[in-house]
């Protein structure tokens, strides 16, 4: 009994000397039956947004325990997101790809949810057009969202809007929240045509038309800084020729490129004064200018063929006629008959 009292006295003295257990921040008084652990996570994202999450967990034990208030730092995966619109040749469907790019050598970030918003007026509010989550409900909205965890890409598809639209998608992962914005310009891209000149050279014509939208801040297509470049690998190819053309009664700006090889998809970097965007354009139809020339060449070849046939027929008729005239003009030799003999009686 005395030994037990002595041990209790020593424990009490030690408790007075160490009033708490030091963690990363503070400590609390012990509780005989309950344990309360409060964890506060402070996260700083790449866009300077700091969030704090406080979690309180209560457990019951049959023995004495210690309540600790600890602050921990959860390290999230550093990444950025680049989104790019994609046009089809008929411009009916909307396709876009958001690529997640890691900034550190950690494993791929676990994207928990993606929410996309859109607006057509620069001053109007954004409305939700798509939602994708690792937990049900899944994929709700006007756009179809699908995430490829292996390629770390978000694929967005739907009907093409009738006017230029701003999009923003929020990516949520463990300890991270990142916003990515991109624009779908219904104009000024009027058309993109590709023509294979020979086995090694291809000509690409990009036609742009004037487009007034709040995103362009009043910038004009005919501004000296307005231009188009083609992406070929890691290089930006400038246009070989820039001119103003009229097509179907519309005034257009034409950019001509010459590429080595044959392509059905080109990536365009369009810059209108201070505003720029990159888009992937798929062209399947051949250049109508080339088709017009081909038709003209075909008609010319047909006319030449008909002239040759006409000359040949004329020559044959003339030759036959000359042969007939020759037969008529040939002297007819009279056949000599003997002098008739009359018998005299």
Curated annotation (Swiss-Prot):
Region Disordered, residue ranges: 23-42
One GO CC term, this protein: virion membrane
Domain Ig-like V-type: 91-190
Residues passing through the membrane, by range: 295-317
Presence of keyword Membrane: yes
Signal sequence segment: 1-23
Intravirion membrane side: 318-345
The keyword Glycoprotein is assigned to this record: yes
Task performed by this protein: Serves as a receptor for the Fc part of human IgG. May thus be involved in interfering with host Ig-mediated immune responses.
Protein name according to UniProt: Viral Fc-gamma receptor-like protein UL119
Lineage: Viruses, Duplodnaviria, Heunggongvirae, Peploviricota, Herviviricetes
